[in-house]
Every structure is written in structure tokens, then in C-alpha cells.
Amino acid sequence: MPPSGDVAVVIPARNESDRIEATVSGAAELPGVDLVIVVDDGSADDTAERAGRAGATVLRHGRNRGKAAAMETGAEAVRLLEATDAPPGAHRARHLLFLDADLGETAGAAGPLTEPVRAGEADMTIAVFTERVRQGGHGLVVGLSGAGIERATGWRPAQPLNGQRCLTRAAFETARPLAAGFGVETALTIDLLRAGMRVTEVEVPLGHRATGNDWASQRHRARQFADVARALAVREPATRGLVAGRSGRGPARIRPGRS
């Protein structure tokens, strides 16, 4: 049985004051979680204050530095807290569960993501939402990421841009430095598979805010596209079958989550 208190949740957040409290509360109730960190990435609202009221440990970027930077900040904070709080000779690295800030109360259903990692069956899990949210224009970026991952590894994930992921500390350190901005998920998948690590997709009943078709949403997708393209540009050309050749096995198929 996995030990209790072996998972830290890291939530990058920017201007999510309307959902962050519910997200933190849901995450804090997950099995194995004893630490929830919110990294406020230059919010203009009271995201940080609300996260703190909900019980999270809050870190703040003075300006918007991007999702990957927020993930690194949160993971480093976990490491420092572990080094400070653990008695001599008892340090044990927590697994890292990354969740989006806009999950709201559905964050409490993320438990199945941690199970393969806590059981030693996977080095990273990727969420597959059982109920897809329609997002205008988002398919172009998903297609770019999925095709790039497939070219690099011979495997195409169902939801390559899904940011809900659980990693061992060793897997996270293997992937550092993280690719910038919104290219982080694409790069994580490629880099860990190339390193011979085990990646599993897990179905979970999570949901978040849909991206619209207004000007701000279109700019957001343009930034996503550019970040994913940059992450892929430095990881090609790649040989199909590289993963199987180095690790002896390919990624696992989608694993149904257990409630």
C-alpha cells in the first residue's frame, strides 16, 4: 500500500479567483495529498488571497512568467519544504500532481491520476477527461502537439495538451529544464518517453473552463501554438520506435480511472 502523505499538489494559477478556492479544497481531499501549493503567476485579481484562505501554501510571481515557470517554482518549493521539515535521514520525495486552477470542485476527482504513480506502475500519468469540453479552434494546437509527439516517439496520446499530470520526483527532474510556457506538456511527454520512463493515460471525470472564440481566446491559442511549435522544433528529427528501443516497452493504453 502506498504511504500516506506522499503526494504534493502544484497548481499554477493566473486570474482564477472565481474557481481557485474550490480547486484547492478538492485537491486537499485527494488520497495521499498532504501539501497543496498554488503558484500565482502574476494575477491581477485576488487569486493568491483566496487560495491562501482555502488552505494552500501560496507563492507569487511578481509578473506573468508562464506555466512552465510556475510549475518549476512549485516543484522547487516542495523540495525545499521536504528538506526543511523532514527529520535527519527521513527525507522522502513526494510525487508531484499538477492541476489546473480552473478545475473547481472537480479537482476532488483527480485521485485516479495518482494511483499508478503511487503504486510504482508509472513514472507519469496524463489525464484523459471523460467529458470533453468544446473549445473553439483548440483542435489545431492539439493536432500539432499530438502529431509531434507521435513523430518523436511513435505514440500519440489521446489528449496531449492535458495539464493534469502526476509525476515521480525523478521523472520531473529528468525533464528539467521544462520547455517554456504552453509547450511544457508536449515536451514532458517526449522527454520522459525518450528517457525510457513509463507513461500512462488515465480517464478522470474532471472539467475546466472552455476557451471561447473572442479576441483574448484567439491570442491565447496563438501563444499555445507558438510554444508547442518551439518545444517540438528542438526535439526533432526523431526516430519512430525510439521509445521501445530504449525502454523495452511503449506507453500504456488509456486506463479507466476508479472512483
Q: For the regions a protein language model found, what residue spans apply to each?
A:
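Short beta-strand/loop segment that forms part of the nucleotide-sugar
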Residues: 11, 32-42, 59
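Hydrophobic helical membrane-anchoring modules
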Residues: 1-3, 177-179, 183-259
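Short beta-strand-to-loop acidic/aromatic patch adjacent to the donor-nucleotide binding site
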Residues: 84-104
